[in-house]
Amino acid sequence: MKHLFILVFILLGFTSVFAQTPLQNAEEFYRQGKFSAALGLYEYDLKSHPNDPYVYYNIGNCYFKMGSMGLAAANYYRAFKLAPRNTDIRNNLSLALSAGGESLVPAGVPPVLHKAFFSLSYSELKGLTMVLWWVFCLLACIWVLKRRGGRITATVAVVFLLSAGWFYMRHKAETEPLAVVAAPVAEIRSGPGTNFPASASVAQGHLLTVQDEKDSWYEVIVKSQGIKGWVDKNAIEQI
């Protein structure tokens, strides 16, 4: 009987371990400092939650702890696009970018204005703009048919135009083909191949704008330095 109780106790212990979700196991690995194991589970979880900013955030944390600042910045940036108001995501993205000599807030832009510009996610702003459009259409119909509500219709029209302008600028930022240097150093060459001379070297964590591609090379612009050239695809991570 005693042996039966011991066996049941052991089985219950194994059951509790296997009952943990991959996310819980990832968190446990992370707390234990097993960042590579945690990363594998977070990336597995990403397959079923591809638009979860906190999964990207946790992946970024793992890469940050492993010293891969470029890949950390790429994943923090993906999280930032989905949840721009989250303070932890914003702070960690700024920290990862600063390690590579970059800044989240462009030079000359007040931080308050930058936060206001990203106070809504792209999908939230798109939804707000669509709602304002339909409200304006409804009020405009009422004004045309009954000649009532002209003032509020004009007010909504102004708010809609402001929202539409904001959305247009966010759309340009959202669709900008960004990448980050993931390798310790990326060589910027004058053409798409190792036979072309290197004009500059860029450390990991620097932000790039992808302009074109040919074979295994991307034509890029280093945003903070204005340098243009070709870089090996394996040296960067697209965001």
Features from the language model and the residues they span:
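Membrane-embedded alpha-helical segments of integral membrane proteins
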Residues: 102-145
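Boundary regions of SH3-family modules and the immediately adjacent low-complexity/disordered segments
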Residues: 69, 143-200, 209, 221-239
